[in-house]
Amino acid sequence: MQDLIAKAKQQAQQAELYQITVTETPVRYENNKLKGIDASSRQINALRIVKDGKLGFATSTGDNLQPLLDMAAATAQFGRDWDLPLPGPAALPQVQLTHPSTVLDTDTLVEMGEKLVRRLAKCHPDLLASADVSARQTTTKLINSQGFAGEYSKSIFSILGGAELTEGKNFLSLYAGYFSGKREDQLEKTIESLVSNYEHGRTNVPVKSGKYTVIFTPQGLGDIINPLLECANGLAVEKGFSPWKDKLGEKLFAEEISLFDDATISFAPASCLFDGEGIPAQRTAIIEKGVINNFILNMVTAKALGLKSTGNGFRSKNGELSSPGNSNVVLEINGTQPLEQLLGSVKQGIIIDSLMGAWAGNPYSGQVNGNIALGFLVEDGRIKGRVKDCMVSVNVFEAFRHQIEGASAEKEWAWNMLAPHLKLSDISISAKG
């Protein structure tokens, strides 16, 4: 890698080489049976150069790096203007990204998938269970002509489980899973979640249209948090799509809410030591006690806004040029109580575990509308059964300003987000008929 950078410096003012190697063993089950084992390994190389003030870029696979320089130089004459200095040497955070528990052989992965599928299949003879169990190891390297040289290895264990059951006109679909850099009890938690939702979901209960207290599970919060993340994205701010462009330092939400992007959590799914541009990973307060504190920025959007990069210049799996993106998202709500008490405080309400179609709206309006894919009616603190053919409508900006009623002390990971169960008041539910 150093040799290529040295050669690039002979014909370009700046150069950067990014390399990621991924080894993965995914085991897949479908319809209660082993579907396949697809072990794979790949290496992606990406060279960025700045030549005569223009950006050149090229990617390749495998170990042969030499053609990259010619390809990048050829694209530079058509590239965008570039006047940003690449990052120099920097102190990197201390983050644990590998753990022996995630080094798993194929037989162990198969056994875990088999255990999940067999347990779900016991619920009902017609239930179709699926599972994806994977162990992935990555090594990321980045070196540039300004003196930055960084490398880290990372391991991720993932388990995703699903179940489908059709009884007459009633269709029940469930899913749950975890991504983590440390294997603990994720298999057991996935099974427990799916079995519990199956047991509660077998009974359909009627619900009328109206305003309800709603508890969003950590998994169900993804669509609710998304407008906040989209508004904080540096590209949306730069282009003027985000309503937060001129709102830094303003209190837009209740004091109880804080929202962070944190790439420095050991063993978390989206942690790293540096981003795809060589900026050290950090914890960024997007919202702190209701105040808009920062945006999610890579180098380009940071310069456009007159701010500093937050270390969120992430690349796609093909190594393409970075764009602003989130690492680990952490939602914090003041005034928590045990989940059992939070649920017990609901006289009549709904638990929402997943939505369908909520992504289709305009995130910058804060409005989220979607079908309740999996939700349950709660009366006097007890789950009565599954609600069907219902839609939820919530303006996230208003909800986080005036409608927070509480949150669970327990937090759970849902993909790359760590969040509590969140209780909101006066949420609109529309029921069919």
Regions found by a protein language model. Give the residues of each.
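A generic local secondary-structure boundary/capping motif
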Residues: 5-7, 34-38, 107, 116-123, ...
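N-terminal alpha-helical targeting/anchoring segments
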Residues: 27-77
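Internal metal/ion-chelating core segments
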Residues: 152-252
